């Protein structure tokens, strides 16, 4: 599916005019890359937001301006920390038959057996680097964790891989694991502490008895 975004060329205008454009719901940006000279642009912020919301950050976006159609990926962006409004977006023009490396979201699916047994699922890696042609970049990669028991874990090597893309990240990178319930861990540590304390007390009593015998 082609995601079309209508944009207009813009001049490098005074800050006051850029502020006015933002108040009108316009976002500023720049497009550069394959067969494209760096060109400042302006577009409706909501149009881009809808594309990225529906198709993910790696969506292939076809920019339309001055009769041109340019296939691009979002290469970087700046957002307002309070409103999340896109203040500036970098679009990278891409060659459709050439692979590029991007980060894809890792989404865990399924209810882990270990969680049903009282454990909890902890995820440490949320994105993985993949290489693919622009049209084949995955929106996300799902990993089924339903068979994970307490103490089990998954790494990048466990991610499903399709012919349309290649996973570039190191295969031994840890993604998630099912850990023991915190209460049980604390109880075991408490029991270990009690055992050590009892052993220490026993050794102390034996030392005292030995001293008394000598006297």
Swiss-Prot record:
<keyword id="KW-0699">rRNA-binding</keyword>
<dbReference type="InterPro" id="IPR011035">
    <property type="entry name" value="Ribosomal_bL25/Gln-tRNA_synth"/>
</dbReference>
<keyword id="KW-0694">RNA-binding</keyword>
<comment type="function">
    <text>This is one of the proteins that binds to the 5S RNA in the ribosome where it forms part of the central protuberance.</text>
</comment>
<dbReference type="InterPro" id="IPR029751">
    <property type="entry name" value="Ribosomal_L25_dom"/>
</dbReference>
<dbReference type="InterPro" id="IPR020930">
    <property type="entry name" value="Ribosomal_uL5_bac-type"/>
</dbReference>
<dbReference type="GO" id="GO:0006412">
    <property type="term" value="P:translation"/>
</dbReference>
<dbReference type="GO" id="GO:0003735">
    <property type="term" value="F:structural constituent of ribosome"/>
</dbReference>
<dbReference type="Pfam" id="PF01386">
    <property type="entry name" value="Ribosomal_L25p"/>
</dbReference>
<comment type="similarity">
    <text>Belongs to the bacterial ribosomal protein bL25 family. CTC subfamily.</text>
</comment>
<dbReference type="Pfam" id="PF14693">
    <property type="entry name" value="Ribosomal_TL5_C"/>
</dbReference>
<dbReference type="InterPro" id="IPR001021">
    <property type="entry name" value="Ribosomal_bL25_long"/>
</dbReference>
<dbReference type="GO" id="GO:0008097">
    <property type="term" value="F:5S rRNA binding"/>
</dbReference>
<dbReference type="InterPro" id="IPR020057">
    <property type="entry name" value="Ribosomal_bL25_b-dom"/>
</dbReference>
<feature type="region of interest" description="Disordered">
    <location>
        <begin position="171"/>
        <end position="215"/>
    </location>
</feature>
<feature type="compositionally biased region" description="Acidic residues">
    <location>
        <begin position="183"/>
        <end position="215"/>
    </location>
</feature>
<dbReference type="InterPro" id="IPR037121">
    <property type="entry name" value="Ribosomal_bL25_C"/>
</dbReference>
<keyword id="KW-0687">Ribonucleoprotein</keyword>
<dbReference type="InterPro" id="IPR020056">
    <property type="entry name" value="Rbsml_bL25/Gln-tRNA_synth_N"/>
</dbReference>
<keyword id="KW-0689">Ribosomal protein</keyword>
<comment type="subunit">
    <text>Part of the 50S ribosomal subunit; part of the 5S rRNA/L5/L18/L25 subcomplex. Contacts the 5S rRNA. Binds to the 5S rRNA independently of L5 and L18.</text>
</comment>
<dbReference type="GO" id="GO:0022625">
    <property type="term" value="C:cytosolic large ribosomal subunit"/>
</dbReference>
<protein>
    <recommendedName>
        <fullName>Large ribosomal subunit protein bL25</fullName>
    </recommendedName>
</protein>
């Amino acid at each position: 599916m082609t995601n079309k975004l209508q944009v207009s060329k813009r001049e490098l205008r005074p800050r006051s005019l850029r502020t006015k454009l933002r108040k009108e719901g316009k976002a500023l940006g720049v497009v550069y890359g394959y067969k494209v000279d760096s060109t400042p642009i302006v577009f409706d912020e909501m149009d881009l937001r809808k594309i990225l919301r529906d198709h993910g950050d790696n969506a292939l976006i076809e920019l339309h301006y001055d009769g041109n159609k340019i296939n691009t990926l979002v290469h970087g962006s700046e957002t307002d920390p309070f409103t999340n409004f896109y203040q500036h977006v970098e679009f990278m023009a891409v060659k459709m038959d050439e692979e590029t490396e991007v980060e894809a979201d890792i989404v865990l699916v399924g209810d882990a057996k270990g969680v049903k047994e009282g454990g909890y699922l902890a995820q440490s890696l949320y994105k993985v680097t993949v290489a693919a042609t622009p049209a084949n970049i995955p929106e996300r990669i799902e990993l089924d964790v339903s068979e994970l028991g307490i103490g089990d874990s998954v790494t990048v090597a466990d991610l499903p891989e399709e012919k349309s893309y290649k996973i570039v990240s190191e295969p031994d990178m840890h993604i998630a694991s099912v850990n023991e319930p915190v209460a049980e861990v604390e109880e075991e540590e408490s029991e270990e502490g009690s055992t050590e304390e009892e052993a220490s007390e026993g050794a102390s009593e034996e030392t005292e008895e030995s001293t008394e015998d000598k006297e």
